[in-house]
Amino acid sequence: MAIETNRYAEQRQQVTGPDPRWRPTTADEMRAYVGMNVMMGVKQLPRIWCYWSTDKRYGDPFISGVMPKTRFLKLNQYIHLRDTSDMPGRDDPDYDPLYKVRPLLDLVSKKFRKVYKPARDLSVDEAMIGFKGRVHFRQYMPAKPTKWGVKVWEVCESDTGYCSNFDVYTGRKPGGRQHGLGYDVVWNITKPFHNKNHHLYYDRFFSSVLLAEHLDMVSTYVCGTIMQNRKGLPAEIASAKLKNNGELLQMQKGNMIATSYKDKRQLTFLSTSQQPFQGQGKPTCNLNYNSHMGGVDKSDQMRTYYPVGRAGKKWWRYLLWFVINLSIVNAHIVYTKSEKDPAPKKGYDHLAFRVDVAEQLIAGYTCRKHKAGKRVALANQVVAPETIGHHKLEKISGRKKICKECSVQKRRTPKGRHIETSFFCVFCDVPLCRNGCFAAYHHRNMMT
């Protein structure tokens, strides 16, 4: 991350001109930056500047003590994960919509499967990363709490919500799909768990007779709701209209059992992991589905308690913060189930674990050169003037003014505002930044 951030900052400055407020970052600083974003999700404030406010009602000394606000915003401006100078175009066969974050996504998904082996029961469902900006694979889900955003398919352990694999949905594939989207999602995302006797639970969006048959061939068993008109279902199930509560109709073919059951409304299930139901009350497939389908919802719930990262225009950053947040949720699950560590102390919950993760990422890092008490004294000292011939740089007695050189070079703050300075050239009566702009402005004018 540090290498690519420095590379991107250099590439941008080749286009827009030198940035006097930027200096190369390091791995330690980027870890601290991530830790600050994690902590901001715990201590949520409405504006980014609030964390550095001197007003005790807003300010957060822990976050503001790591680095100045200007440095944090500079890292926000230039953070990058991959060199995009060689990114394939949309017409290229190698085009990947997730090119900017692909290495991170692949690395993290492999780590999820390596560090923890899930139990038998897994649920497959969709999650949403809230995003209202511009990206061609943004989705609208009116029935979801988060209606606009990027859709992510997840397979999670039913009991704990541990996410073992995920895949970002980037829209329709060229050439279409042979068996449909639902089939492809479940088959591809559960490949690492084939031939391991897992039981999968998913809803009717994914469910089909063909998918259940193919998963059964790789010793992976399913239970889920299914649309009554799906191809391959028995005609009796497809046409069933149950009238009384508790009424049940079952049809079996090999390991596959199709069940139609009337509760408050008529439900249809397809299962290869259950035995035919012969008792009273709700059938086994219904009970197991209700018990094991909520794995993805558990993971989502833990992730939304403490969101990581701030809102912005760049879609890929939402995926970065999603991965970091999901990693913390998974890490907490692994910690609580670990046999190597002693039993967690009373009160050491997800919140306490998350705060410790943020603190260890920061690990005492600070890029501040002066203590807070000394900064006030330094601000009142007379700044030594800089000179170039008869041109002299001095401090403006009143409020700051827009830097002439920054304006010419079209530099802006991360929020798009003009850059202001507290210094000006006495001879030219031109406001100029102390670091770089004073010399650059006069050198350019002398050359012309």
PLM region spans:
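Acidic, contiguous segments within the catalytic cores of piggyBac-derived transposases
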Residues: 1-448
